[in-house]
């Protein structure tokens, strides 16, 4: 495909037009009085949202240079959302302000690399200040306030705080769409995975189609079990102990399955066969998690353990195992706390080193099942609002977790506006000092935009907030200047610093760009004759 190339001012201005088109659509949603944006879908009803990253994803521009500019800002929103779950609109507003001020200085003759260094030094100083100023989140009320602001609904904040209180900060909180209106919270005790019994004959409660084993042994096998002679020696030992047995394996089939079912029906021996969750390496890892949770071992040829020689010492134990046709829950495994803590640390390290969003999500689920528990928030709303509400709750959950992780600062853009005094641009020289001043100007952008959306004069509000004591700012919902932390208006530090760092990173890229190579727009082909006739033929 042919390419089109733009240089110098033309290249940067093209990128800036794309950035502005996207930022102008996103920034109207900032703050408690932010507006909504309607997104047209190819199929189905339009989506109504005030979520920055959702709006950014939908914007596709025609001009090739503008398109690249918009894509770069989408990356800012996406990275901030990935790291912190919120702050996408703040990041976009900051990026727009940094680029606007930066390009003005480049046009006036400043060296882009000097500006870049100044921006980086100023951002580093602000980040350090925010982390030092952060207040730890210790109470349920603080979590509720943080999540409530993110979701734009105090009731959602309270429900998320309740869920976090129950499952702990490592626990998984998932959000599902519900057919009924309102919000519901479901809590799962123990480790749950989405595989059930292999045969309905294992059910101990025929009406509920559920098998409940009290104080069972847990046998974990990485392969298939098909012959009864491999299983028999271990079965005899378990029967002598008088305990039921839960078998979790890749599959249980043939005569081994028939033997278990016949013994269950006759009442000789209570057991249940369950398919192991996942595939390949993920299945092996999950079986190992279960082994550590229950204090057992995974029987696998890879480590030299075979089923026919295994004794009771390789079996795990739990207070209860509940199995339905779709899922299994292991309650109160007998594994040692030290081993579980070691496994949790290992999974946490894997999460930090993973580049894949999908892998990170799956590792996070495994971590929660070992360390905390699982809470499900079921959200119901009118059809056109349902997806948007679910997305808002998911963002609020991640926001609350970010607050617990690094603490909170005053919200409403005030912590950024008041951070302009923490670095001394006079200590820098030339273009580096100019770069630091660009950051100082841009730090006011979020509070100014919140003021605009609330129908207030942005310059006056920014000036007043900047000169107020630390933590004091504008409550845009009421129009009152007050102690924002005391009023429950706060932002997680992780969200605020991620927004600034990602915005500065993309702004530096804009300023140091000297050429843009883009695909040349294709000319539309000649229209096809709808009658199917031959072109150019006249009859």
From Swiss-Prot:
Gene Ontology annotations of biological process type: protein refolding
Superkingdom of origin organism: Bacteria
Gene3D superfamilies cross-referenced by the UniProt entry: GroEL, GroEL-like equatorial domain, TCP-1-like chaperonin intermediate domain
Keyword Acetylation recorded: no
Pfam families on file: Cpn60_TCP1
TM ranges: none
Listed GO CC annotations: cytoplasm
Chief subcellular location: cytoplasm
Keyword Chaperone (UniProt): yes
Catalytic activity: ATP + H2O + a folded polypeptide = ADP + phosphate + an unfolded polypeptide
HAMAP family in the record: CH60
Subunit composition and interactions: Forms a cylinder of 14 subunits composed of two heptameric rings stacked back-to-back. Interacts with the co-chaperonin GroES.
Protein name: Chaperonin GroEL
Source organism of this protein record: Tsukamurella tyrosinosolvens
Gene expressing this chain: groEL
């Amino acid at each position: 495909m042919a390419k089109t190339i733009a240089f110098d001012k033309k290249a940067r201005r093209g990128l800036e037009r794309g950035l502005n088109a996207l930022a102008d659509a996103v920034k109207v949603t900032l703050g408690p009085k932010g507006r909504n944006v309607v997104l047209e879908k190819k199929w189905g009803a339009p989506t109504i949202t005030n979520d920055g990253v959702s709006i950014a994803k939908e914007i596709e521009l025609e001009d090739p240079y503008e398109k690249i500019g918009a894509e770069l800002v989408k990356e800012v929103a996406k990275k901030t959302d990935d790291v912190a779950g919120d702050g996408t609109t703040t990041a976009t507003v900051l990026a727009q302000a940094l680029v606007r001020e930066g390009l003005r200085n480049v046009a006036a003759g400043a060296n882009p690399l000097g500006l870049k260094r100044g921006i980086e030094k100023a951002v580093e100083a602000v980040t350090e200040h925010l982390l030092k100023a952060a207040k730890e989140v210790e109470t349920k009320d603080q979590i509720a306030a943080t999540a409530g602001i993110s979701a734009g609904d105090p009731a959602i904040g309270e429900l998320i705080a309740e869920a976090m209180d129950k499952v702990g900060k490592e626990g998984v909180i998932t959000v599902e769409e519900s057919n009924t209106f309102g919000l519901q919270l479901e809590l799962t005790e123990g480790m749950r995975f989405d595989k059930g019994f292999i045969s309905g004959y294992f059910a101990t409660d025929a009406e509920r189609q559920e098998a409940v084993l009290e104080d069972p042994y847990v046998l974990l096998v990485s392969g298939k079990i098909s012959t009864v002679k491999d299983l028999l020696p271990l079965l005899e030992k378990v029967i002598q102990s008088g305990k039921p047995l839960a078998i979790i394996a890749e599959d249980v089939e043939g005569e081994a399955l028939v033997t278990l079912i016949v013994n269950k029906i006759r009442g000789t021996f209570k057991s249940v066969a369950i398919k192991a969750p996942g595939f390949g390496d993920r299945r092996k890892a999950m079986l190992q998690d279960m082994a550590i949770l229950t204090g057992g071992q995974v029987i696998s040829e890879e480590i030299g353990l075979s089923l026919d020689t295994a004794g009771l010492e390789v079996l795990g134990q739990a207070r209860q195992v509940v199995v339905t046709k779709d899922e299994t829950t292991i309650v109160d495994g007998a594994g040692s706390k030290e081993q579980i803590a070691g496994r949790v640390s290992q999974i946490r390290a894997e999460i930090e080193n993973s580049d894949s969003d999908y892998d990170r999500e799956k590792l996070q689920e495994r971590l929660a099942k070992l360390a905390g528990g699982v809470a499900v928030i079921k959200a119901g709303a009118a059809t056109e609002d349902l997806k948007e509400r679910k997305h808002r709750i998911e963002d609020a959950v991640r926001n609350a977790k970010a607050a617990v992780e690094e603490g909170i600062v005053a919200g409403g853009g005030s912590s950024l506006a008041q951070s302009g005094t923490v670095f001394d641009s006079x200590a820098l020289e030339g273009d580096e000092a100019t770069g630091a001043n660009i950051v100082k100007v841009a730090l006011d952008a979020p509070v100014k935009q919140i003021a605009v959306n609330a129908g207030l004069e942005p310059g006056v509000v920014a000036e007043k907030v900047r000169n107020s004591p630390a933590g004091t700012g504008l409550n845009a919902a009421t129009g009152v200047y007050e102690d924002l932390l005391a009023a429950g208006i706060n932002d997680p530090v992780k969200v605020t610093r991620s927004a600034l760092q990602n915005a500065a990173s993309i702004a530096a890229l804009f300023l140091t760009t000297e050429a843009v190579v883009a695909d040349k727009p294709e000319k539309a082909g000649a229209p096809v004759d709808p009658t199917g006739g031959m072109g150019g033929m006249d009859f």
